[in-house]
Swiss-Prot record:
List of residues binding S-adenosyl-L-methionine: 113, 133-138
Nucleus keyword on record: no
Keyword Chaperone: no
Top-level EC class: transferase
CDD domains, per the entry: TrmD-like
Task of the protein: Specifically methylates guanosine-37 in various tRNAs.
Pfam families from the UniProt entry: tRNA_m1G_MT
Protein name per the record: tRNA (guanine-N(1)-)-methyltransferase
EC numbers on record: 2.1.1.228
Length: 246
């Protein structure tokens, strides 16, 4: 997967390219992240990248000319078929379904806003989709872009040591993940659930599904409203609810 990034702070993306799962993906040639800074497309000695908004008001907007030229440079490097995404509070909210959709793209260009945002005409002429990571305000689009890169890269074959890790993550099937345990077997008097030590894979699968359903019911009940539960899932959820009556 190839991802181009338009950002005034390209050095921030070393967190993606140099560390963790994504860093290994870059090292192994499974993921490529290339950055362009609008500041490199300025022609004044101050390398100006912001401009005043028409109509007045507080704050500045990203200057149109450097931003457009940076996007055009990224498009030229990407070639045909690259989807251009603007990280914006006005965009579609990113969830696991959206991550799965975005992961089908082999090329993406992520545009990170700063200041009060981007000229609407740039969005209309250069941007294919807008995406948001939540209903809150950040200083820029870099952290949302890194969130998007990290989440979609997990679906690139070979990135995770065990591909089932991505398939069993929270939200993949619309449910929260089940609890997990490792050594020691007893920690401050709290024991690992015996079923996980039993070696009975059918019972372990059943326990994990039951806990996943129950945790979703307790913490994010609205997620269950959009799911068509199987007969087995309904039975397991009912069991969990009986066991956890207030």
């Amino acid at each position: 997967m190839w991802i181009g990034v338009i950002s005034l702070f390209p050095e921030m993306f070393r967190a993606i390219t140099d560390y963790g799962v994504t860093g290994r993906a870059v090292k192994n040639g499974l993921l490529s992240v290339q950055c362009w800074s609008p500041r490199d497309f300025t022609y004044d000695r101050h390398r100006t990248v912001d401009d005043r908004p028409y109509g007045g008001g507080p704050g500045m907007l990203m200057m149109v000319q450097p931003l457009r030229e940076a996007i055009h440079a990224a498009k030229a490097a990407a070639g045909e078929g690259a989807k251009v995404i603007y990280l914006s509070p006005q965009g579609r909210k990113l969830d696991q379904q959206g991550v799965c959709e975005l992961a089908t793209n082999q090329k993406m260009i992520l545009v990170c806003g700063r200041y009060e945002g981007v000229d609407e005409r740039v969005i209309k002429t250069e941007i294919d989709e807008e995406w948001s990571i939540g209903d809150y305000v950040l200083s820029g689009g870099e952290l949302p872009a890194m969130t998007l890169i990290d989440s979609v890269s997990r679906f690139i074959p070979g990135v995770l040591g065990h591909q089932a890790s991505a398939e069993e993550d929270s939200f993949v099937d619309g449910l929260l993940d089940c609890p997990h345990y490792t050594r020691p077997e007893v920690l401050e008097g709290m024991e690992v659930p015996p079923v996980l030590l039993s070696g009975n894979h059918a019972e372990i699968r059943r326990w994990r599904l039951k806990q996943s359903l129950g945790r979703t019911w307790l913490r994010r009940p609205e997620l269950l409203e959009s799911l068509a539960l199987t007969d087995e899932q309904m039975v397991l959820l009912a069991e969990f609810q009986r066991e956890h009556k207030p």
